[in-house]
Structure formats: C-alpha cells, structure tokens
C-alpha cells in the first residue's frame, strides 16, 4: 500500500461543505475522518467504510469489498468498499458516497462500548 496525497487533497476539497476532513497515517495508507468520524481508507485508491445496513447499496454499485491476506495466508475482509469511479472527478458523487460511509462510521462508533477508566471497579 502506498498513500496518495492527491486523493486526500481531493477528498478534503470535495467534502469541505460537509465538514472537516482529517487523516491519520497507518501502515503506508491513511485513515480519513469527517468531523472526527472515520469514513475511508486511502492508499492508491479510496475505500469507503461500509456495514450491513449499507451493503446492498455498495453491492448494487458493484463496489468490491476490501480484502487482504493475513500472515497465515488466509484471505480476510474488512468493512470497506472500493469507491465508485465517479468519486474521483465528481464532487457530488464524492459527497454522496462519503456521506453513506460516514453514516456507517457513526453506526459503528455507536455500537462500541465506552472504555472503562483504568482502575474502575467491574460493573
């Protein structure tokens, strides 16, 4: 994986009306956030966050699931989908698909239990 700074700049510019896009570099790629909500991974292409609620929409568009081979040679998938080709040159498409990904990111964050402070007694 190699991070494409140009894709980040494009996403940042296209999504400016929706909020602030930020990134965190990770293993040669970058995780993108919109107003603090994870919504994509960028390497040499964009992979949008997805979930069971949005799977049918991504499937209908033919957006492949993110897959990788783990250290034991097993192929694994993650809840990210390859961006439709129109997001690379159409602001409205970028906003539409990124919004769907942000919704998945918000649902994912809502499902996670808050971490207990260190030293807190068991509940």
Where are these predicted regions, by residue range?
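Charge-dense, helix-prone N-terminal extensions
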Residues: 1-123
């Amino acid at each position: 994986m190699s991070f494409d700074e140009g894709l980040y700049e494009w996403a940042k510019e296209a999504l400016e009306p929706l909020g602030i896009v930020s990134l965190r570099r990770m293993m040669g790629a970058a995780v993108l956030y919109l107003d603090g909500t994870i919504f994509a991974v960028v390497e040499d292409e964009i992979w949008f966050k997805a979930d069971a609620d949005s799977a049918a929409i991504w499937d209908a568009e033919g957006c492949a699931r993110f897959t990788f081979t783990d250290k034991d040679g097993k192929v694994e998938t993650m809840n990210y989908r390859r961006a439709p080709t129109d997001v690379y040159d159409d602001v409205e498409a970028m906003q539409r698909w990124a919004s769907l990904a942000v919704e998945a990111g918000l649902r994912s964050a809502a499902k996670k239990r808050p971490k207990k402070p260190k030293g807190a007694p068991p509940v």
